[in-house]
Regions:
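Conserved Nudix-box catalytic region and its N-terminal flanking loop in Nudix hydrolases
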Residues: 44-87
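Short connector loops at helix/strand junctions that flank enzyme active sites
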Residues: 35, 55-57, 62, 89, ...
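A short coil-to-beta-strand element that immediately follows conserved catalytic motifs
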Residues: 88-97
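Nudix hydrolase/Nudix homology domain
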Residues: 3-10, 58-59, 128-172
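Active-site-adjacent beta-strand/loop module that shapes the phosphate/pyrophosphate-binding cleft
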Residues: 100-128
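Acidic, metal-coordinating catalytic segment for phosphate/diphosphate chemistry
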Residues: 6-39, 110
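Short, well-ordered beta-strand micro-motif
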Residues: 42, 119-123, 140
Length: 172
């Protein structure tokens, strides 16, 4: 279940799994952690974008997740793409840095994370698409079809920034 309250910008994603996303919701719980995360826009040679359907909130997304101790940003990005999709990529650019304190994700263990994600561009190297415990579907999607996919606004913003071919990374 998800949606916006009529006439408002509040966005809340509720799923039958362990995560609730809040965006611009005054009733959202207060963040108690910030976890550095990466997300990656990986286009193929036809400019289609690699998307996954997340198992934790059922929404479509670009691959990504939290960094692990000892990892560089590049290593975390490559690992997340490979783990969630089966695709190998090389990191070639920066879309932006996203740190909206009005976007939090509440987990059933009591953790409430404030968004902090570095969104990168990945060049497809190889591999075959496959699902994982974090992705129930994996596919390359033409940019013209992306508006028809249920994507959280924070992820849609990143995809749009990539598609705009911005000359400077987004910082916000």
């Amino acid at each position: 279940m998800s949606g916006r309250s009529p006439g408002s910008s509040i966005w809340k994603v509720v799923s039958d799994v362990a995560r609730i996303d809040y965006l611009d919701d005054p009733a959202a719980p207060e963040a108690n952690s910030i976890v550095p995360a990466v997300s990656v826009v990986v286009p193929d040679d036809q400019r289609r974008i690699l998307l996954i359907r997340r198992t934790d909130n059922k929404y479509w997304s670009i691959p990504g997740g939290g960094m692990e101790p000892g990892e560089s940003i590049r290593e975390a990005a490559g690992r997340e793409v490979k783990e969630e999709t089966g695709i190998d990529c090389d990191i070639t650019g920066l879309v932006g840095i996203y740190s909206n304190p009005r976007h939090v994700a509440a987990y059933d263990d009591g953790e409430v994370r404030q968004e902090f994600s570095i969104c990168l561009v990945g060049r497809l190297l190889g591999g075959s698409t496959r699902t994982s415990n974090e992705s129930s579907e994996v596919r390359f999607v033409p940019p013209a079809d992306i508006p028809g996919y249920e994507i959280h606004p924070s992820i849609r913003l990143r995809i749009n920034h990539y598609l705009e071919r911005r000359t400077t990374p987004y910082i916000g």
